[in-house]
From Swiss-Prot:
Active-site feature positions: 101 (nucleophile)
Keywords linked to the UniProt accession: Isomerase, Mitochondrion, mRNA processing, Transit peptide, tRNA processing
Catalysis performed (reactions): a uridine in mRNA = a pseudouridine in mRNA; uridine(55) in tRNA = pseudouridine(55) in tRNA
SUPFAM superfamilies: Pseudouridine synthase
Primary role: Minor enzyme contributing to the isomerization of uridine to pseudouridine (pseudouridylation) of specific mitochondrial mRNAs (mt-mRNAs) such as COXI and COXIII mt-mRNAs, modulating the efficiency of mitochondrial protein synthesis without changes in transcript abundance or stability. Also catalyzes pseudouridylation of some tRNAs, including synthesis of pseudouridine(55) from uracil-55, in the psi GC loop of a subset of tRNAs.
Protein family: Belongs to the pseudouridine synthase TruB family.
E.C. designation(s): 5.4.99.-, 5.4.99.25
GO cellular component: mitochondrial matrix
A Pfam family matched in the record: TruB_N
Protein name as it appears in the record: Pseudouridylate synthase TRUB2, mitochondrial
Region (Disordered): 292-325
């Protein structure tokens, strides 16, 4: 049985996540999702055309055949025909969450219908995000990426994993101080103490980028991989941080990959691949993510469930892998 397009359209309200590949602009991702939805909605069963009563000729009477009998008949209104009025659905407002630049990849949250309001609520909730960031030692470029114009080449034989982890510990300690400063809580209060002990201290206003946790997942010179949990960041800020880590190690470094593995309650596991950017998959993703977004709509998110553990440099030797959500 064919689905009724208006009924399907009414189900498209909520948040879902897609996986943005590298080298693709976020606007292209959003426009592709919108185009696919419109195409499939217009292919579904539409409302039938309105009917109007017309008096149509039913035959002739009289010897000369000029007298015509007209009978009332219901005929469709031609103005409602798709070839006259065009497709029923021409625009769907698809909103975007925290964006990824063209070189980055990973979790990209989108909203449809009242999901656009949830995007604003999600922004005001100040969720953290997880990234896997890869760097390469021995070179510095103008834009901090391996494709940028090279401005310096250095040696890196003196760098060890222990030296790298000491730098990461300094970064995390410095950012913890910034976190306390921007939390706008009375540092002598019991509330501030409890939040700090539980690792739930967060700035509830817009602040500079803050690194909540950072650790080394892999160290194979000249390449290394970091796991970073942060908030209020940009991808370029993370690339610059790789550059500064290289300088602190008396060398240089460029960023070769920035991949977001979690944005608030949304993880890679619940993100739709490019082959899944269709109506059915998006409907299913919205249903599955509804429970995760209930806390966002209430304005009181369960941070511990949504954000997961904070990585730290001291756990760097425990093993390698993706970010935990």
């Amino acid at each position: 049985m064919a689905q009724f397009a208006p009924g399907v359209f009414r189900t498209l309200h909520g948040l879902f996540a897609v996986y943005k590949p590298p080298g693709v602009h976020w606007k292209s991702v959003r426009d592709t999702v919108e185009t696919n939805l419109l195409k499939e909605l217009n292919a579904l069963k539409q409302r039938p055309p309105r009917q109007q009563i017309r008096f149509l000729p039913a035959g002739t009477e009289g010897s000369n055949g000029l007298e015509v009998t007209r009978v009332p008949s219901a005929v469709p209104v031609l103005a409602d025909h798709v070839l006259v009025k065009g497709p029923a659905f021409t625009h769907i407002r698809v909103g975007t969450g925290h964006r990824l630049d063209i070189q980055s990849s990973g979790v990209f949250v989108l909203g449809i219908g009242h999901g656009n309001k949830l995007l604003k609520d999600m922004y005001n909730s100040h969720f953290t995000r997880d990234y896997t960031v890869r760097g390469m030692l021995g070179k510095a470029t103008e834009d901090f990426t391996e494709l940028g114009k090279t401005i310096e080449k250095t040696t890196y034989d003196h760098i060890t994993r222990e030296k790298l982890e000491r730098i990461l510990a300094v970064i995390q300690g410095t950012n913890q101080k910034a976190l306390i400063t921007h939390s706008h809580l009375d540092l002598q209060s019991q509330e501030a103490y409890d939040l700090a002990v539980q690792g739930k201290l967060r700035p509830m206003v817009k602040s500079p980028p803050i690194i909540l946790g950072i650790r080394c997942l892999e160290f194979s010179p000249p390449e290394f991989t970091l796991e970073i949990q942060c908030m209020h960041e940009t991808q370029q800020y993370l690339r610059k941080m790789i550059h500064e880590i290289g300088l602190e190690l008396r060398s240089s470094a460029v960023c070769t990959q920035v991949r977001r593995s979690r944005d608030g309650p949304f993880t890679v596991d619940c993100s739709l691949l490019r082959t899944q950017w269709d109506l059915g998959s998006i409907q299913g993703a919205i249903r599955e993510c509804r429970a995760q977004t209930e806390g966002v709509s209430r304005g009181n998110p369960d941070r511990e469930a949504a954000e997961g553990p904070i990585p730290g440099p001291s756990r760097g030797a425990e093993g390698e892998g993706e970010l935990r959500a």
